[in-house]
């Protein structure tokens, strides 16, 4: 039997990334700091999905010698994470109010794309049907998603 566990993304700023996913509705379910390995693992899940479908945020600590931390770019080559949300318009409004660009607005009331602080593409899908509504219906795409 195969069971999905999680998707892992590397992050440069754990606090900013956790705050981003909290705006979507995920919650931190556990955290592990490895002094020996010099990394932190943070697991997030939608309410009721703990242990079923999680996102693992991996933060590799800066080198002890003071050299620059690894720069994680090119998040688009990961593909994307997808979440069903209760109200796509409210979720996108909360993300936009927090300074996140809605790269593919929910013009159809069904689907939107945003990026995490680390450039990971996140697809938002409406749970159920919503009529197309302004200002979203007439917004153009911004950048890649």
Region spans (language model):
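Core segments of cupin and vicinal oxygen chelate
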Residues: 2, 8-52
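Eukaryotic phosphotyrosine signaling hubs
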Residues: 4-6, 76-80
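Vicinal oxygen chelate
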Residues: 31-33, 40-43, 83, 89-145
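A short, acidic/glycine-rich surface segment
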Residues: 39-40, 63-70, 132-133
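Active-site/binding-pocket entry motifs
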Residues: 49-50, 61-64, 130
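A contiguous binding-surface segment within folded domains or other stable secondary-structure elements
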Residues: 66, 79-80, 100
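Short secondary-structure subsegments characteristic of cysteine-rich extracellular domains
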Residues: 70-71, 78
């Amino acid at each position: 039997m195969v069971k999905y566990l999680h998707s892992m993304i590397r992050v440069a700023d754990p606090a900013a990334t956790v705050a981003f996913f909290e705006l979507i509705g995920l919650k931190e379910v556990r955290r592990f700091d490895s002094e020996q390995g010099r990394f932190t693992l943070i697991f997030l899940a939608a309410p009721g999905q703990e242990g079923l479908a999680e996102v693992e945020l991996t933060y590799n600590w800066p080198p002890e010698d003071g050299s620059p931390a690894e720069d994680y770019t090119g998040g688009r080559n990961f593909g994307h994470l997808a979440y069903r949300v209760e109200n796509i318009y409210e979720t996108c409004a909360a993300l936009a109010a927090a300074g996140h660009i809605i790269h593919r607005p929910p013009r159809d009331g069904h689907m939107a794309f945003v990026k995490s602080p680390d450039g990971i593409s996140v697809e938002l899908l409406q749970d159920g049907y919503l009529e197309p509504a302004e200002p979203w219906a007439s917004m153009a795409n911004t950048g890649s998603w």
